């Protein structure tokens, strides 16, 4: 009897390739379309693809839960003066967790997604296609989530995936322009999205901008709309780069671009993929501070269950409080990750 795998489906090339690859292995593939936000404009097309390929299909409306469990926390991060990587949060706390819940409901042995990341037992690592690598946004997954997760695209290049989907007869989907940015903002900048949801943020206009001598040199539109390293959108003379944000005072501090480089990061909210006892202090590890970052080596100075301190040999540009950092072992599998608490 074939094992059943639940695949989260959209009309994207990656999720479609995932379902078709697993069906060819063979698994008994079950497709689920999670309606998370806005209109479910691709629903009927996804349903037809499943019917044409003899894939069991389910539709689940999760709009209310997604708003409560993802969009509100997303806004809360910014209101605290933090810069979230909401995709890693959403994957662990919502999407993968919901897939597991519905896998049990639909009697599936595994779940699968179209993320580009390698898998070895319960470890997740950098994809073969390093440019498309999405391991960064999966670092917060629990061991239970990782054990049940299949990642069939981890050993494939993006062009291979597109060619496979074309060969399966879905030229239009293979040629579809890739979407970037947040899935729930409908192409809008996050600041515009926040203002729509929280119009009271207009009250933060005319916040003060200070230089390194604490002199007031201009104004800004409100601290939630800015991040470290940003220079656009400030009402002050010259090209000034943000190097500090004090949310409680609605205050922003600026200076030269060189003042936005830092070498030491303190992390909190740690999630471990490997045993902490096997992680060595004063050792250099490949470290990513952004999803599309190729990574650079940082030395681990402190580690506990609650916090970590890492030091880069070359300073990194614009680390931000709340931002994720992921640390990899010598084989490019995730050791642990966390959120930036402070930097210096």
What kind of region is each of these model predictions?
Residues 1-139, 159-160, 166, 242, ...:
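ATP-dependent adenylation/nucleotidyltransferase module used to activate substrates
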Residues 2, 112-118, 124-344:
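AMP-forming adenylation/ATP pyrophosphatase catalytic core
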């Amino acid at each position: 009897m074939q094992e059943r795998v639940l695949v989260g489906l959209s009309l994207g090339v990656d999720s479609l390739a995932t379902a078709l690859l697993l069906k060819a292995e063979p698994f008994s593939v079950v497709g689920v379309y999670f309606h998370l936000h806005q209109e479910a404009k691709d629903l009927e097309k996804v349903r037809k693809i499943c019917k044409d390929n003899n894939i069991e299909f389910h539709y689940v409306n999760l709009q209310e839960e997604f708003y409560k469990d993802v969009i509100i926390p997303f806004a809360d991060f910014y209101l605290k003066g933090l810069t979230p990587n909401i995709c890693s949060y959403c994957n662990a706390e919502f999407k993968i967790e919901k897939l597991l819940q519905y896998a049990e409901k639909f009697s599936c042995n595994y779940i699968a997604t179209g993320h580009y990341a390698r898998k070895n037992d319960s470890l997740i690592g950098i994809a073969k296609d390093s440019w498309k690598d999405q391991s960064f946004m999966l670092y917060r997954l629990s061991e239970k989530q990782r054990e049940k997760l299949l990642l069939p695209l981890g050993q494939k290049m993006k062009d291979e995936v597109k060619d496979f989907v074309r060969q399966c007869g879905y030229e239009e989907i293979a040629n579809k322009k890739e979407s970037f940015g947040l899935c729930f903002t409908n192409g809008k900048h996050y600041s515009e999205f926040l203002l729509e949801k929280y119009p009271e943020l207009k009250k933060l206009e005319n916040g003060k901008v200070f230089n390194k001598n604490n002199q007031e040199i201009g104004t800004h539109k409100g601290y939630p709309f800015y991040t470290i390293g940003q220079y656009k959108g400030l009402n002050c003379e010259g090209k000034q780069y943000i190097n500090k944000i004090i949310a409680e005072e609605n205050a922003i501090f600026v200076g030269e671009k060189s003042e936005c480089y830092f070498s030491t990061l303190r992390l909190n909210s740690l999630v471990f993929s490997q045993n902490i006892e096997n992680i060595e202090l004063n050792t250099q590890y490949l470290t990513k501070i952004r999803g599309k970052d190729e990574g650079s080596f940082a030395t681990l100075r402190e580690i506990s269950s609650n916090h970590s301190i890492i030091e880069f040999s070359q300073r990194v540009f614009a680390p931000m409080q709340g931002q994720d950092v992921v640390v990899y072992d010598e084989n490019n599998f995730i050791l642990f990750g966390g959120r930036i608490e402070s930097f210096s």
